[in-house]
Design a protein with these regions (language model features):
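Hydrophobic ligand-binding cavity/cleft-lining segments
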Residues: 1-29, 143-148
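A structural detector for beta-sheet-dominated domains
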Residues: 4, 33, 41-43, 80, ...
Length: 148
């Protein structure tokens, strides 16, 4: 996905939870730092996942393991400067070679696609996307209060 913002700004959007919470998860217990274990929460669904930060290369790469408690997989973001814009790719690997693994891979691909689209609209237009919130409207907790 091409995001028309500088690489440092796009990279920070995925490493600083105060920014990421505008377009993807709703809370993280800390920012990404090498070797850190943290929790990302999607409050609207009452869902969280534990994350291990394996590598960070400022403005170039993020490598994590996530879903540490249930079928962990590796996720890698790469950031490539293209003039005043940044090309971002997300790879998610390590799924089981089974029907359940295939289903999990497809669901993850959908989620990361929404996260990239959300990052693009937030960073380029300062519009809070509600893609993640609106993906499963029937599963949103009745007590959830969006930032809108």
């Amino acid at each position: 996905m091409l995001i028309r913002r500088p690489a440092d700004e796009v990279y920070q959007a995925f490493t600083e939870p105060g920014v990421t919470a505008w377009f993807w998860f709703t809370h993280a217990d800390r920012r990404l730092t090498p070797g850190a274990q943290l929790t990302w929460t999607w409050g609207m669904y009452g869902v969280a996942t534990r994350v291990l930060v394996k590598a960070l290369e400022a403005n170039r790469r993020i490598l994590i393991d996530w879903n540490l408690d249930d079928a962990p997989t590796e996720v890698e973001w790469t950031f490539e400067e293209r003039g005043p814009a940044t090309w971002v790719e997300i790879s998610n690997r390590g799924f089981a070679a089974s029907d359940a693994g295939m289903k999990a891979a497809l669901e993850a691909m959908e989620g990361f696609t929404l996260a990239l689209a959300g990052a693009k609209i937030w960073l380029e237009r300062a519009i809070e996307p509600t893609f993640i919130l609106d993906r499963f409207p029937d599963q949103v907790l009745p007590s959830w209060k969006p930032k809108l």
